[in-house]
Amino acid sequence: MAKAAASSALEDLDLSREEVQRFTSAFQDPEFRRMFSEYAAEITDPENRRRYEEEITALERERGVDVRFVHPEPGHVLRTSLDGEHRCYVNVCSNSLVGVPSSRPGPGRGGTAAGSHWSLPYSLAPGRQYAGRNGARYTVYDVVFHPEALALARSHERFREMLDATALEAVEQQFGVRLDRRNAKTLKIKYKGMPEAAVLRTPLPGGVPAQPEGEPPGLFPDPPYPYRYPAAAAANTARSPASPAPEAVQRPEPTEPRCSVVQRHHVDLQDYRCSRDAAPSTVPHELVVTIELPLLRSVERAELEVKGKLLCLDSRNPDYRLRLSLPYPVDDGRGKAQYNKARRQLVVTLPVALADARQEPPAATPEEPAEETGTDDVARTSAGDFAAAREESADGTGADHGEKSGVGAPDPGAAHAEGELVPEPEQDFGGDSVAPLDLGKGTSPGDRSLPYSAFPGGDTESLCGDPGVQTNEEQERTRHDTAGSAMGDPGTESIAPVCPPLQCNQDEDSLTLLIQVPGILPQTLHGHLSPVGYELCFSTQDSGYSCTLQFAPENKLSTREPETSVSLNNAVIVLAKSPESHGLWREWYCGLNKESLEERLFINEENVNGFLEEVLCSPLKQARSLAPPLIEVLQATDEQVQIHAELQECSDPAGLQGKGKGVREGCPLSEAEAADQSATSPAASDSAAAVEALKINTHGSAVDLQHGCPEVPHVLSGKPLQPEAKMDPEFIRESSTTYSTEEKENIREPVISKGEKINGDHPSSLLNKTVVQNIPDFDTIKETNMQDGSVQIIRDHTTHCAFSFQNPLLYDLD
């Protein structure tokens, strides 16, 4: 704004390319430069200027106008600011052609004592722009009084104040600008800029003189410039009485400088991924406040103070005072200020306190509380602090809720013993944490419990084998009952909150919680932070949610307030790690309350390696010793690793040949042969144990265990796995019988026919019938070089898989 206002008039000059080229070539010609120099000297010659004024005076007299050139004589200079943007100078000058100041006695205004009322005639010239030494532009105005007025000003201080106030007021009223009267200062110089004569035009008493007889009329009428000339019969020649000069009033208040506030955001490409948790925050990272101080030479005279959402600036000589209310609370301890002397601007950069900014509830309109109170859509609950949070939503207030419930330390042993299974939702939300598939040894399937809170949407199949669990229709009916109770049905008084679908991502210094619940009411979102845990409760229009998070004792959270961002589809909460706990954590615990915490693992290399060791190293040994299989890596990409495993012949080939068909080393079985062999020789199919294909999805938490022929290639993709799944002897979840170790060894392994698989996307099918088979140790890996065909057998093999972004197109375009 300031730059646009101070721009030169040459910026409006519209020249074509041809005209620019002509000017360039002309000024490169020495003859043209000589002629141009002579022209400049001619128009600046005082004698030529005098002749020019005489000719203009004679021409205007012929048109009935008396023209007098007013040459300003130096007096004193006032320095101030123009519209709060750049400097301005007012030359208080004198000339004998201006009227003499006069006074008359009269009563004072407002009942004050009698005094003198002065009349100060003046002549005002248009402003002129000049460029300073550093390129900054300033404006100069000339206000011309009679020499007697300046003489009185030099001898009387109060008269001088009145004269200066009259000059400033004349410039403001005539040109429609705003001058800083409070900080107007008298300089030691007598004149600023190059003197330019002004013109006084007054109509002649007789009007336009008659045209001499015999002189032919002109071909063209007189132009109306610069104004309409008075008629000959006009008698309105009396001058109107001059308005009384302003009295010497009290010193005005300090000037409020112009300022602008810019919200600065940091662009991060990961906020523009194709994922629900990737969204730019509406709260800016910094506020940049630019304050225009055109009269301030040094910041030593200014005092700046920032408190919360208020910025205060005070200055003496020049007098500035600013009280600016900021849109967000800022961290004044990390702010910085810089003064640009060239532009006379103070730039203050203030980081936004994200925790304080996001804790403030949005200002509710007057209609919102009435609608919420009338409909009463929010379900009521009698569960402690959650009920208080729900009351805040119904009343539309932001009062703090009641006492927080205590959070106990997580007990991994208890989590294993209870064996509650809380699956993640079926949708793929791009998380990097998994929930362990806890199949404990000492707990029967009938003793395992699964609360309804494990199903946030009500459309996930039951994970327990009990026939009394809720079906999809029953869960849908339960949701309708919940909505009915929220509407105030007399049959129900309250409902219990449920655990929301939650995902947790981590980096070196923070945790990001993604709450996949649409329509969250921001005013009901409350959290309680502790070094080892975090409690959260919130509600929507028709349901309530509550959850408790715990972490290992060695993993501590920072006491800094969490960063919260609520959208229409979800909510994101960022928890900072304590400085001594920076790094990647292994596990976290989540549940409805501290009694129902369940362990969940983060996706990292340590957890993946541990799970592979559990899967590939079975605790039971096969009755018949098999030769270690050969593992061949077929394909290794950023997204998946494809492995082909072949079982070698047994060391006692006679035993297998007596049963029927032998296992051909290095030759995979066709589907027909595999089906025939499994139908005719169950023992042979038992000896050829199926190899499981483990798929690890980085976008979800489901496990896909796929059983098939040993010759089928096995794929290890980037999906998260369940490291806690114990590869115990097989058992059926419907049965609650507990077997001993000896009995487990004698259980016959069922034969999995072609096409059978247990899909990890449906946890109910996995847990209702969980089949775990003995897998021989994979001691060697046969790797084939795709270029020269050479084969290399590796016994100690380590694989590192690179990560890939979900939407690499954004990075390719960058």
UniProtKB/Swiss-Prot annotation:
Organism's domain of life? Answer: Eukaryota
**Where on the chain is Phosphoserine found, per UniProt?**
S444, S618
What coarse category fits the chief subcellular location reported for this protein? cytoplasm
UniProt tissue specificity: Expressed in nearly all organs of adult, with higher expression in tissues known to have motile cilia and flagella, such as brain and testis.
The UniProt keyword set, sorted, is: Cytoplasm, Phosphoprotein
Stretch list, region Disordered: 234-259, 357-490, 654-686
Where in the cell does this protein reside?
Cytoplasm; Dynein axonemal particle
Q: Where are the transmembrane segments?
A: none
Query: Briefly, what is this protein's role?
Result: Required for cytoplasmic pre-assembly of axonemal dyneins, thereby playing a central role in motility in cilia and flagella. Involved in pre-assembly of dynein arm complexes in the cytoplasm before intraflagellar transport loads them for the ciliary compartment.
Family recorded in the similarity comment: Belongs to the PIH1 family. Kintoun subfamily.
Subunit structure, per the record?
Answer: Interacts with DNAI2 and HSPA1A. Interacts with CFAP300. Interacts with DNAAF4. Interacts with DNAAF6/PIH1D3.
UniProt protein name: Protein kintoun
